[in-house]
Structure formats: C-alpha cells, structure tokens
Amino acid sequence: MPKGANGPRGSRSTAARDTLRVRTSTTSQSFMPRRYKADPSKGYFQVEWPLFGELSRALALKVARAYDPELVVGIATAGVIPGAVIAAILDRDFRSILISRRNDDAPVRNTPTVLGAAPQEVGGRRVLIVDETCESGDTLRLAVAALVNAGAKEVRTAVSFRTGPYEPDFHGLETESVIVLPWDREILVDGELVPNPKYEDQ
C-alpha cells in the first residue's frame, strides 16, 4: 500500500467521491471548473482563490482517473502551493524540488537549472510532478530527468495552467494569458501589502 494512502485505490467512501464529482466539471477535455472561463486574450488572467480551489479539485480528479502516484513533488517555488494541495486531495505524501532560472530575484540564465537535490523518497515510487504553469516544458523536463535519475519508478507531470505548446500529462486550464496567482498578486513592502510590481503594467 502506498505510504500516505488510506487503503487500496477506490476505497474512499462513495459520499466522498460523489462530493468531488459534484464540485467539479468533467465536460471539457481540460477539466475546466464550472462557471469559469479562461481569458482567450494574451493579457493577464487573474486567478481568484475560488477558481484555484475548484481547479485543484478538478485536476486531482483527472489525475486519479488515469494514474496512481505514491508521491507528489512540487517544483519550487511556484509549484509548491498547487503541488501541496493536489497531494492533500489525493492523500499522498508531498515533497519539493527547486528548479529556477533566477537567483536572488535576478535573472542569471536563459534555461532553468536544478538548484537542489531530488527528494530521496522518490526512489522506487510512482511520482507526480506538479507546477503552476508550463510553456516550453524546460522546467518539467528537468524535473522528470532529476527524479528518474534519483530512482523514481514512474514519473508523470501535472500543471494548473498550460500556457504554451508543451503538453504535460495533466493540466487544468489552457490559456495564452499571463497567469496572476492569488498568492502572488500582492507583496509586503514596509509593512503594507502593495500590488506586485511585476504586474504593474496590467
């Protein structure tokens, strides 16, 4: 039995499964949560907490129907929050791996780099990698390679938002817009919350 599971897959109560089905929409290929539409323009798409919650539930359900991960790994930093939420919904252990194009908030490279060791717990296990967005797929490919090299038995990928040509194994919404996540919209400056300057041209 995978560590962190309550029992064999499918052993959750019928009520719990029905509740999850009711609260998500499975009518579209990308499992878009009900009542929400991705902005088709290439502007900014502000993600509210209710959308993030529904999207996470829908994405977790999509994963569970096709894959049974034993461990969820979020790509730090932006993939940690969706990764932890997906892990909680799936009732699986959660770890993270640091991959970035930046160092101390300053761009230092054109391609992402693995900045920390892969979690040792991936050895011999089925793993789901989670990130918030993917466009070129460079970060996800690096993460997959790092976990395979660390001994993972099988690795699949999931993102909340697919924003480019790369196709992860699972995604929530597909949009060409710049994603503004609810936890990234404001930052603390001199003790006050102010709009994140990287979105100041919105």
Please place each PLM-identified region on the residue numbering.
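PRPP-associated nucleotide enzymes
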Residues: P2-Q202
